[in-house]
């Protein structure tokens, strides 16, 4: 799979913003 790096960053940014 894909590494949960982009997902983590995107999820955090989405929750914060």
UniProtKB/Swiss-Prot annotation:
Gene Ontology terms describing biological process: tricarboxylic acid cycle
Binding site for NAD(+): 11-17
This enzyme's EC code(s): 1.1.1.37
Catalytic activity: (S)-malate + NAD(+) = oxaloacetate + NADH + H(+)
UniProt keywords, alphabetically: NAD, Oxidoreductase, Tricarboxylic acid cycle
Top-tier EC class: oxidoreductase
GO molecular function, a single term: L-malate dehydrogenase (NAD+) activity
Entry keyword Flavoprotein: no
Family stated for the protein in its record: Belongs to the LDH/MDH superfamily. MDH type 2 family.
Task performed by this protein: Catalyzes the reversible oxidation of malate to oxaloacetate.
Name by which UniProt lists this protein: Malate dehydrogenase
Provenance organism: Acidovorax delafieldii
Source organism phylogeny: Bacteria, Pseudomonadati, Pseudomonadota, Betaproteobacteria, Burkholderiales
């Amino acid at each position: 799979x894909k590494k949960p790096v982009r997902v983590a960053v995107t999820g955090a940014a989405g929750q914060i913003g």
